[in-house]
UniProtKB/Swiss-Prot annotation:
The keyword tRNA-binding does not apply. GO terms for molecular function: ATP binding; glutaminase activity; metal ion binding; NAD+ synthase (glutamine-hydrolyzing) activity; NAD+ synthase activity. It is an enzyme of class 6 (ligase). This is NH(3)-dependent NAD(+) synthetase. Belongs to the NAD synthetase family. The lineage of its organism: Bacteria, Bacillati, Bacillota, Bacilli, Lactobacillales. Pathway: Cofactor biosynthesis; NAD(+) biosynthesis; NAD(+) from deamido-NAD(+) (ammonia route): step 1/1. One of its GO terms (cellular component) is cytoplasm. One of its GO terms (biological process) is NAD biosynthetic process.
Amino acid sequence: MSLQETIIQELGVKPVIDAQEEIRRSIDFLKRYLKKHPFLKTFVLGISGGQDSTLAGRLAQLAMEELRAETGDDSYKFIAVRLPYGVQADEADAQKALAFIQPDVSLVVNIKESVDAMTAAVEATGSPVSDFNKGNIKARCRMIAQYALAGSHSGAVIGTDHAAENITGFFTKFGDGGADILPLYRLNKRQGKQLLQKLGAEPALYEKIPTADLEEDKPGLADEVALGVTYAEIDDYLEGKTISPEAQATIENWWHKGQHKRRLPITVFDDFWE
């Protein structure tokens, strides 16, 4: 089996999907998880205004609406939380996403003071914090905020990881990679767009250029620029298609470099890193 085939199998990507079936699959998955854990009553998710959190948020909201209708338990709620660092440049996009999601509860936790305090505390030891490192601190503070809210509201944290992000390791370890449940896992980027289209999202919600937007020196840096490969190439690879040798090498290099992000902390029994 080729590495491409191994990755596709591991991530569970289909070459072609039925968008309605995948919507139902994700909603039912979220509902089953809460039914299995009756002490959980909420899902919490940070909403950035990008495609992934918009899709995951809408699926979570639909799951909660169905659970309330099926059980008569009005304590089932979806909590959408904005997590800006100061003022977010594309706040209007986040508000469009919230208008589409229509969450039961919408909160704002501004992470700027927490991030700046942690950065200052680390630098006080004589250890410089690079802009890239500070970007990861932002992602991890967002994770802390979501888990704090989940802890306050008997909840679980939803993650937005999907196949095109997972294969490249394009997430912060213990940051946006920290979550309890991943309703988009198995979908590539274009398939996520198909689900949003089926859900009736306006084009602006899925045509926006993807960006992690964590670095202040490079605001709004496009994912594709940071990765050195396009999402179209990543999606083609995940669908089993032939792409250029250069793009394939780039994708597979990211796969190898990001292996540690997909695993629990390394033990003496692990050898994948050797």
